[in-house]
Amino acid sequence: MGKKINPLGFRLGANQSHRSIWFAQSKSYSRGLQEDEKIRDCIQHYVEKNTRISSGFEGKGISHIEIQKKIDLIQVIIYMGSPNSLMEGRTRGIDELQTNVQKEFLSVNRRLNIAIIRVAKPYAQPTILAEHIALQLKNRVSFRKAMKSAIELTEQADTKGIQIQIAGRIDGKEIARVEWIREGRVPLQTIRAKIDYCSYTVRTIYGILGIKIWIFLDEK
C-alpha cells in the first residue's frame, strides 16, 4: 500500500521552513500545540467573518500563519493575499483582531503581537486557490470548471505546475470518488523542487469534500 508523506514536511530544511517556531519541555509540548491551533482558528474565523461582505474572489484569503514564541512574547505573522480587505471600513482592524485572540487563550504573562504581510503572488498560494475552488463548489459550479479556473489563475503567477484533487460526493453523486487534474510538472519525489501544498475541507449541501493542491514553484 502506498505511503504518502506530506510535501511540506518532506522538504523541511531544504526549501521549506517551520510555521511554528518555539521550544517547550515534553510535558508542556501538547499545550503549546493546542495554543497554536486556537490562535490559527481564531484568526481564520475573524478573517472569514470580516471579509465575507466583499464581493468576488480576488485572492483575499490567508495563505498561512507563522507563530513565533518567546518567554514574554507571542509573535503572529499572517500572510494574506489582500490585507486591505480585512481593514476596509475598520480603523482598528488589527487591534480588534489582537484583542479577540488575546481573549481566546488568556495569556497574562506574555504579550501578543500580530503583523500582516501581503503575499506577492496570491494565486501561487495553494490555500488561497483552495478557498477559491471551495467558494465555487458551494455555489454549485461544476468541479471541472472550478479546477480549470484555478489553473488559469496559477498561470498568472508564473508557476511551473499544479495538481488539484477533489474527493467526496462530487456533484451530489451517491458514491464518493476522487477526481484530479494536473497541468505542467509536479515532481513530488524531488526534494530540491520547491512545492507548496495544502489540504482543505469544504462543507456543501451534499456533504464534505476534500481539496488537495500541489503547486510546483521553482527548482533549486
UniProtKB/Swiss-Prot annotation:
GO terms for molecular function: rRNA binding; structural constituent of ribosome. Pfam families: Ribosomal_S3_C. It is found in: Plastid, Chloroplast. The keyword Metal-binding does not apply. Coiled coil: none annotated. One of its GO terms (cellular component) is chloroplast. InterPro entries: KH_dom-like_a/b, KH_sf_prok-type, Ribosomal_S3_C_sf, Ribosomal_uS3_bac-typ, Ribosomal_uS3_C, Ribosomal_uS3_CS. Keywords: Chloroplast, Plastid, Ribonucleoprotein, Ribosomal protein, RNA-binding, rRNA-binding. PROSITE patterns: RIBOSOMAL_S3. Belongs to the universal ribosomal protein uS3 family. Part of the 30S ribosomal subunit. This is Small ribosomal subunit protein uS3c. The gene is rps3.
